[in-house]
Amino acid sequence: IKSNTGVDVPVVAVGKLGYPDIAEKAIRDGDCDMVMLARPLLADPDWCNKAFAGNVEEIRPCIGCQEGCVNEFILGGHPQCAVNPRTGFEERFPETFTPAEKKKNIAVVGGGPAGITFALIAAKRGHNVTLYEKSEKLGGKIAVGSIPKIKFDLRNYLAYLEKQVELCQEQYQLQVHKNTTVTAELLKEKAYDSVIFAYGTKEIFPPFEGREEANLILGTDLLEHPEKAEGANNIVIVGGGVVGCETAHWLANEYGKNVTVLEMLPHFMMGVCTANRGHLLHYLEKSGVRLYNCTKVKALAKDGVYVEQNQSQTVPDPYNTWQPLLPPNIPNPMEKAIKEEIVEKKIPADLIVLAMGGKADETFFFEAGEEHLAKEIYNIGDSSRAGRVLEAVRGAYHLAVRI
């Protein structure tokens, strides 16, 4: 194969080739001589052995978030992995789990990434584990977040988790109960030694003026029920975080909607890895999605959103894809002060989507403590602190290996 210089040299392909079928096709079709893997090996160091043996379903896939392998550098850390807590800590956490000193009956409330990760490890260590999920499907927020086509990496990770749960049920007698709402009465009746709460967040739903008359829906609800956007041509999304921006891309590209995203801060998707943030902003602009930063919602109406928008020339360009965003504790000497030129306006909307994030829901956790529903009670994942897959999986892993 010739390189783009026309010289006969080996060509190595790298980047988003972390699935054996894609990597093999690239070599077979003559697109490259070799495939180089980096992030996929952080997610699963045994990638090559599993692929060679044909155990593709057992490969833990990289989800492409770059939060552990890249963003941790910005925060002063070292390479990690959102889906593999051992990465970077191999000496601290052996590859083989240590059997539990005392076998316990454990209930896990919530089948998201934190709940599943804990349940798998605890069961493999010898505990009797029962995993409860209130919906018909495991995955929690990643089940919803993986709906857009661009989130195929997350869908593959969810499929991997489901496969691991299936194997754990067969080999380690993990019990799984879907469509089950856990109550204090149920926990009292079962008398578990330990209860692990991992049931996620409460959506933030501000008391905007006029919300009773507005055609309003939560972003997560819309992802699960896209039919609710039928007949809506102009859609306004309130919240310019990653959920709001990914939902905007989904609506514009998969349903052909006219979408506007409102963000009160100067930048969209604060805290997201610069590369991922930049790519999504680029495609939002390409898709015709309107991004309004420094824009504060004042009231909602049946046919639109009333806002106060800072239209000063000093407001950052929301489509600036490669502007590095430093952590809040690091001052940027190159950043210019933003002046205020506030203009009140109404943005037309047939449908208003709230994507303002969530907050930890600790209600049941504290109730369980007050009623002494188990000898040991723990709170992990988003129900402890709203975060990313990285924090959810890492926290669950750390608890599961020592309980």
Give residue ranges: language-model regions.
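Rossmann-like dinucleotide/flavin-binding elements
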Residues: 27, 103-134, 177-188, 199-212, ...
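Internal, charge-rich low-complexity segments
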Residues: 289-293, 301-302, 306-328
